[in-house]
């Protein structure tokens, strides 16, 4: 079993987007710690299977971040399940999870399931609109959510999701100060090694996504934070 705690860098691939074999090879051979597959819309069983089969050729941990029940398939090392803490719709707190367990709970290997305390922070993102997330939150709110995740829910991961927008470093730092046991993931808008380096000061794990499809060379450069890290 892979040790998620050791991950510093993850590439996130959207199954609804095209990526060439050459670019995929470059990502998977880049020394990233893991590949995550996930997206907000147009995520289907077919495109998840297709992308998974291409990534499986490489000796890397492979994660499915679940966005709908229909696209859950066997064959991943881990299944990350977001519970969106600032969603105003209980579907995205535990409603989808409840529905999935009613159907498939008897066959779930819970050693592969990782619950993420998720904060959606980009008001213009598709995921914010889909989940009806209250993104108008300040540092004190982030600190309260971090305490909730770390001290009360005792979740293994907290994920600050800016979804295409580069985030507020002070909020990431605030969360990191209070997460003594929970691992902090940051994702959103990282387009350069400088931004990756800045967020990696506070997040245990950075997730790099959109830049893969805009500039593969810049995406690959973000992996350098692993060699620079003193963690």
From Swiss-Prot:
EC number: 2.5.1.n9
Any single biological process term in GO: glycerophospholipid biosynthetic process
Sequence positions that bind Mg(2+): 14, 40
Gene transcribed to yield this protein: pcrB
Pfam families listed in its UniProt record: PcrB (PF01884)
Single Gene Ontology MF annotation: magnesium ion binding
Database matches in Gene3D superfamilies: FMN-linked oxidoreductases
Cofactor: Mg(2+)
Pathway it works in: Membrane lipid metabolism; glycerophospholipid metabolism
Keywords carried by this UniProt record: Lipid biosynthesis, Lipid metabolism, Magnesium, Metal-binding, Phospholipid biosynthesis, Phospholipid metabolism, Transferase
Catalytic activity from the UniProt record: sn-glycerol 1-phosphate + all-trans-heptaprenyl diphosphate = 3-heptaprenyl-sn-glycero-1-phosphate + diphosphate
Protein name: Heptaprenylglyceryl phosphate synthase
PANTHER family: HEPTAPRENYLGLYCERYL PHOSPHATE SYNTHASE (PTHR40029:SF2), PTHR40029
SUPFAM superfamilies: FMN-linked oxidoreductases
Subunit description: Homodimer.
Binding site for sn-glycerol 1-phosphate: 12, 159-164, 189, 209-210
Family membership: Belongs to the GGGP/HepGP synthase family. Group I subfamily.
Superkingdom: Bacteria
Keyword Nucleus in annotation: no
Function description: Prenyltransferase that catalyzes in vivo the transfer of the heptaprenyl moiety of heptaprenyl pyrophosphate (HepPP; 35 carbon atoms) to the C3 hydroxyl of sn-glycerol-1-phosphate (G1P), producing heptaprenylglyceryl phosphate (HepGP). This reaction is an ether-bond-formation step in the biosynthesis of archaea-type G1P-based membrane lipids found in Bacillales.
């Amino acid at each position: 079993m892979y040790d998620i705690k050791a991950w510093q860098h993850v590439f996130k691939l959207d199954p609804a987007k095209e990526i060439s074999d050459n670019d995929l090879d470059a990502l998977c051979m880049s020394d990233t710690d893991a590949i995550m597959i996930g997206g907000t819309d147009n995520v289907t069983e077919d495109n998840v299977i297709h992308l998974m089969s291409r990534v499986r050729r490489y000796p890397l941990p492979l994660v499915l971040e679940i966005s709908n029940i229909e696209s859950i398939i066997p064959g991943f090392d881990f299944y990350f399940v977001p519970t969106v803490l600032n969603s105003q719709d209980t579907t995205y707190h535990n409603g989808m999870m409840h529905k999935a367990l009613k159907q498939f709970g008897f066959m779930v290997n819970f050693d592969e399931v990782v619950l993420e305390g998720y904060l959606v922070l980009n008001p213009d993102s598709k995921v914010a609109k889909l989940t009806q997330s209250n993104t108008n939150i300040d540092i004190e709110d982030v600190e309260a959510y971090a305490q909730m995740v770390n001290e009360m829910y005792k979740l293994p991961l907290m994920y600050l999701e800016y979804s295409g927008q580069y985030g507020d470093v002070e909020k990431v730092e605030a969360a990191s100060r209070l997460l003594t046991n929970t691992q902090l993931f940051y994702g959103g808008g990282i387009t350069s090694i400088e931004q990756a380096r800045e967020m990696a000061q506070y997040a245990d794990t950075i997730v790099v996504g959109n830049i893969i499809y805009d500039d593969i060379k810049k995406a690959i450069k973000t992996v350098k934070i692993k060699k620079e890290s003193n963690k």
